[in-house]
Design a protein with these regions (language model features):
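Metal-dependent phosphoesterase core characteristic of DEDDh/y 3'-5' exonuclease domains
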Residues: 1-6, 11, 27-140, 145-149
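Extended hydrophobic/Leu-rich segments
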Residues: 1, 22-23, 120, 159-161
Length: 175
């Protein structure tokens, strides 16, 4: 089911709860792992929790039991703030960098198949390539630091241990 296309889903007759149970089976199969997203804290993780709740399934499946969350959108934003040349971005009318995957992909990886933009598989490929680019750039220290805060426990330990801890917040296109 994962990345097999919308056609397969349309031709099946799964109910919402059957689909959610199947998704939870995949989560169990792949766990424990670090669930990595682009804007997951703003969309993916929230959606999964709400739909799991509606289906009477465990709502924190992807961040308990050894699982952790990582959202690379804030990592990319922080990297661009401190190392402006690490990613090529277009600029919005309000003079802010644009961090949409279907914009970042072609700007940074011209060989991407543009016919697949904003599909699950293309978003995954673009996310992976952005992560690799950040890891291999001057922003690698931000990339590495992001891995230290993928769980509540590790984030708390890091914050309590360090004398200085920096985080970046993003509001309406501004850091």
């Amino acid at each position: 089911w994962v990345n097999k296309g919308f056609d397969r889903m349309q031709s099946s007759n799964l109910s919402h709860i059957e689909m959610m149970k199947l998704l939870h089976q995949y989560i169990d199969k792949w766990s424990p792992c670090i669930w990595t997203t682009w804007n997951g804290f703003g969309f993916d993780f929230v959606l999964l929790q709400k739909e799991s709740y509606k289906s009477l399934l465990p709502i924190y499946k992807t961040n308990l039991g050894g699982n952790e969350h990582c959202d690379f959108l804030p990592v990319a934003r922080a990297s661009k703030l401190f190392f402006p040349d690490c990613l090529n971005t277009d600029i919005s009318e309000k003079k802010n960098p644009i961090f949409k995957l279907d914009n970042l992909g072609p700007r940074n990886f011209p060989d991407l198949d543009k016919t697949k933009m904003h599909t699950a598989i293309q978003d995954c490929e673009t996310l992976l390539r952005v992560m690799k680019k950040l890891k291999q750039s001057k922003a690698s220290q931000i990339y590495e630091a992001s891995k230290l805060t993928t769980s509540k426990l590790s984030a708390r330990e890091k914050i309590e241990k360090e004398r200085v801890f920096t985080t970046c917040f993003y509001f309406y296109g501004k850091m």
